[in-house]
Structure formats: C-alpha cells, structure tokens
From Swiss-Prot:
Record text on subunit structure and interactions: Interacts directly with the RNA polymerase.
Cited NCBIfam families: dksA (TIGR02420)
Purpose: Transcription factor that acts by binding directly to the RNA polymerase (RNAP). Required for negative regulation of rRNA expression and positive regulation of several amino acid biosynthesis promoters.
Domain of life (superkingdom): Bacteria
Name of the protein: RNA polymerase-binding transcription factor DksA
Gene: dksA
Tagged with keyword Metal-binding: yes
Family of this protein: Belongs to the DksA family.
Amino acid sequence: MQKEKNKKQSSLSILFMAGVQPYKNKKNEKYMNTKQIDHFKKILIAWKNQLRNDISQTRLNIQDKATNYPDPIDRAVQEEEFSFELRHRDRERKLIEKIEKTLKKVENKDFGYCESCGIEIGIKRLEARPTANLCIDCKTLSEIREKQILG
C-alpha cells in the first residue's frame, strides 16, 4: 500500500515539477493529438532540466565538501558519501539519456505506442512514467520473463 502511494506521489511530482495538471481526455479525442504531444513534451523537458540542475548541484556540493580529513575513518565516510552521490547522479544521467530518446520519439511522432506490440500505451501510464516504451501488458510479460531467467 505504501509503495503504491509513493509511486503515485512520484508520478504527481513529475507533473507538478513540469507545472502541469493531469491530462483530461475529451470524448472522441484522437490519441496523441497535438495537445497531448505538447503536454508530454512539456513534462519531459521540465524533468530533464530538473535532473540537469540536480547533477550540477551535486558537483558544487562535492567541491564544497571536499576536505582532506586527517582521520582515515572520516575520509572513508566522506568517500562513501561521494561514491553514493556519484552513483545516484549516474543513474540520473542515464535517465536524461532515456528522456532525450523519448523526446526524439515525440519529434518523430512515434511517442505513446508500445515498441513491442504497437498499441497505445495510454495517457495515465505515460504520465506516471513518461519514458515508458511498453504497454502495461508487454511490460508485465517482460518482467515475468526476466524473473524466470534470473530465477
């Protein structure tokens, strides 16, 4: 239950960060029309900019906190903190690459459709994870296969 609540909060935080409200479909509205494309483009660009700002801030923080402690334990703690921050930022860098790939799909009008089966991914799923490239059914199958392979 708590995990589901956190997912919903993180999905909403992406929308909040972009300064947009959840998209409201209108009756008989064409999927991935100009209005929807603009909605997701705004979300993706804001998300990418936020991640870039976070990465820049981390660099500044590491430079500010870099101290040569005489105590080896203090140095080890500091190195571990820096290592953790850098791993976190590396994940964010990879996410930026995924966002840029998704923005190219938006430009090429390939956005919003499952790469595996070609059906619509859906507005709500894309708002929850704008970089999603599989519909929920194909993603579920992919995760089941992954569990079977990895044990």
